[in-house]
Amino acid sequence: MVKMYYEADVKQEVLRGKTIAIIGYGSQGHAQAQNLRDSGYKVVVGLRPGKSWDVAAKDGFEVLTVAEATKRADVVQILMPDERQAQVYRDEIAPNLKSGAALCFSHGFNIHYAQIVPPADVDVIMAAPKSPGHLVRRVYQEGFGVPGLIAIYQDATGNAKDLALAYSSGIGCTKAGVIETSFREETETDLFGEQAVLCGGASELVKAGFDTLVEAGYAPEIAYFECLHELKLIVDLMYEGGLARMRYSISDTAEYGDYSTGRRIITDETRKEMKKVLAEIQDGTFARNWILENQANRPGFTSRRRLESEHGIEVVGEQLRGMMSWINKDTKKEEVKIGQ
């Protein structure tokens, strides 16, 4: 069984009086910075000039260059996109990192795949909320917290675990519960979930269902509702109570179709391919390909993004979502928060 930690396990004094630098002010950056400040910790934000600088300043933070924020900080939480972290670390963080400080991450990609190699005299920890930033912030403001993960990669001071727990408490996670993991486990399972299920798997399944109905002569609008729009209804039920809650809530006809058809779609061959995907994550193949793609200025990524945006489901979806005022309102409200 995994080890769970809660508020009673936290030694907040290990973080009191320290300066925390949040590097990046996107989805997680804005939420973690504000939660930590509201928990009574001293927070500065390290950024390069741009939109996020103005947003962080408007939110009342002292905004510094990444180099200056690192010089000032006892804890440096790197919350920039994975593909930008290594260069920013080499150019601006590493030369200014204090001995005995802590490097903190919310995803282990750059540590696990050695794109960031920290010096031996700093702690390297993870504090990873298992929710998007806007939810991390909203739930904290309601007096609660979202679940999270902690991991220790390097314990130079002997206080790394206590520091990870105190940081997690500062952003609200120990109110819900924090699971101890490793940088390897978090990185590999996170990438697999994204690729095989949440993003790659789900998007291809949705498109395949949409295409099947449209090619059979059904209206694209109806296909969109059946294969994409209603997915949220099902996922929300799973989120609230697992597969059992979902199956309890749907009709018996839908439940019978689940049992009789599901394994015809996700076949043994699909499961074998999932194992190949996991192996490519474990042996570094995916990481190498993604790093090289970025070094080449993302030609394949950019091309695929354009092609996907032209798929029929996007065309009809844009029209139908225009009828849904609540979606447009919610999207606009979070637009600033999720931009990097």
Swiss-Prot record:
Catalytic residues as annotated in Swiss-Prot or TrEMBL: 107
Reaction catalysed by this enzyme: (2R)-2,3-dihydroxy-3-methylbutanoate + NADP(+) = (2S)-2-acetolactate + NADPH + H(+); (2R,3R)-2,3-dihydroxy-3-methylpentanoate + NADP(+) = (S)-2-ethyl-2-hydroxy-3-oxobutanoate + NADPH + H(+)
GO CC list: cytosol
EC number: 1.1.1.86
UniProt pathway: Amino-acid biosynthesis; L-isoleucine biosynthesis; L-isoleucine from 2-oxobutanoate: step 2/4; Amino-acid biosynthesis; L-valine biosynthesis; L-valine from pyruvate: step 2/4
Keyword ATP-binding attributed: no
Protein name in UniProt: Ketol-acid reductoisomerase (NADP(+))
Gene of this entry: ilvC
